[in-house]
């Protein structure tokens, strides 16, 4: 079966490597154009492109798939199926119709929950008990196509956006291989999504990481985990922007206003929240690396002291 793979970041690269290791015939790889990265802002290939280069697969990097020439180029590959994972380009209906079996998407949620760009982080921030991978038959909507296969995983109390991303990337590879095996046997059937259960995982922004201390400690703790490693969470102490890397939610409340530091011990800094108390255990001061509160105290830093106001 002739497969065209379309994807860009590490999540997609993991699935591509799994397909290659399973012996599938990838006749072409579509990925985003090279982007500037690093201190030198040098043009760098996407993780998916790097896998393709390492394995000798032809790479295609159109800015858009809307032009007829781009669609003709794809059609010339004569794909039986196109597998899409975090590609980053909209696929017009004409493209969806080119492969014999259409386009299959690897989506990092249990659809119809968390359609959209940031399902991994949104699931953690919302306090979901589980998430997973859905293999979906793509249509013209945003993650609205028929569901073909699902794998689920619990979200643990210490999962971060990073740890859950890596686990789901591995699961995505397993799921698409299972789907391809069923497709070859002719028993891959779709289930229509229930629109009443659908919600959207909107794209993340850096500003969303600004901690609102009027929220509950539990909500803030989940946000810190969800946004680790990107876009990260932060709070301001006067003119200083302090990044928060790890924290835990405590049930006990305080008579202090939200954002007030109420204690600083070696095991953490306690901050009053709208409900409960947040214990910060790892933070990053301007111009410094992330460090434990114990190390921060050992360094003599006079920040995050009782009575100080964070906002």
From Swiss-Prot:
Which residues participate in (6S)-5,6,7,8-tetrahydrofolate binding? 109-112
Task: Give the record's keywords alphabetically.
Answer: Protein biosynthesis, Transferase
List the residue ranges forming a coiled coil, or say none.
none
**GO CC, one annotated term:** cytosol
For the protein in the UniProt heading, the enzyme class is transferase
Q: Which Pfam families match?
A: Formyl_trans_C, Formyl_trans_N
> Example GO molecular function term?
methionyl-tRNA formyltransferase activity
EC code(s) of this entry: 2.1.2.9
Reaction(s) the record says it catalyses: L-methionyl-tRNA(fMet) + (6R)-10-formyltetrahydrofolate = N-formyl-L-methionyl-tRNA(fMet) + (6S)-5,6,7,8-tetrahydrofolate + H(+)
Q: Which family does it belong to?
A: Belongs to the Fmt family.
> Could you tell me what this protein does?
Attaches a formyl group to the free amino group of methionyl-tRNA(fMet). The formyl group appears to play a dual role in the initiator identity of N-formylmethionyl-tRNA by promoting its recognition by IF2 and preventing the misappropriation of this tRNA by the elongation apparatus.
Q: Which NCBIfam families match?
A: fmt (TIGR00460)
Q: Under what name is this protein listed?
A: Methionyl-tRNA formyltransferase
- Organism name: Marinobacter nauticus (strain ATCC 700491 / DSM 11845 / VT8)
Q: List the top taxonomic levels of the source.
A: Bacteria, Pseudomonadati, Pseudomonadota, Gammaproteobacteria, Pseudomonadales
């Amino acid at each position: 079966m002739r497969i065209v793979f379309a994807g860009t970041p590490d999540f997609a690269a993991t699935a591509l490597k799994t397909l290659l290791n399973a012996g599938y015939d990838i006749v072409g790889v579509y990925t985003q154009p090279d982007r500037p990265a690093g201190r030198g802002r040098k043009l760098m290939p996407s993780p998916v492109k790097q896998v393709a280069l390492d394995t000798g697969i032809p790479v295609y990097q159109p800015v858009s798939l809307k032009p007829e020439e781009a669609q003709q180029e794809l059609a010339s590959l004569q794909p039986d199926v196109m597998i899409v994972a975090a590609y980053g380009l909209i696929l017009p209906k004409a493209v969806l119709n080119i492969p014999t079996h259409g386009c299959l998407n690897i989506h990092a949620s249990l659809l119809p929950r968390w359609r959209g760009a940031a399902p991994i982080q949104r699931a953690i921030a919302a306090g979901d008990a589980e998430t997973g991978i859905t293999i979906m038959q793509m249509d013209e909507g945003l993650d609205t196509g028929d569901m073909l296969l699902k794998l689920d995983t619990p979200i643990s109390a210490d999962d971060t956006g990073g740890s859950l991303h890596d686990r789901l990337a591995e699961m995505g590879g397993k799921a698409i291989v299972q789907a391809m095996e069923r497709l070859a046997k002719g028993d891959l059937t779709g289930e229509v999504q229930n629109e009443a259960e659908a919600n959207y995982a909107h794209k993340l922004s850096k500003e969303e990481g600004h901690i609102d201390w009027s929220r509950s400690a539990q909500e803030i703790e989940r946000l810190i985990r969800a946004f680790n490693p990107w876009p990260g969470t932060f709070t301001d102490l006067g003119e200083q922007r302090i990044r928060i890397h790890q924290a835990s939610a405590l049930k006990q409340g305080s008579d202090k206003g939200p954002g007030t530091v109420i204690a600083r011990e070696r095991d953490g800094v306690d901050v009053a929240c709208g409900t409960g108390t947040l214990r910060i255990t790892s933070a990053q001061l301007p111009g410094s690396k992330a460090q434990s509160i114990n190390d921060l105290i050992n360094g003599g830093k006079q920040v995050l002291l009782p009575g100080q106001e964070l906002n």
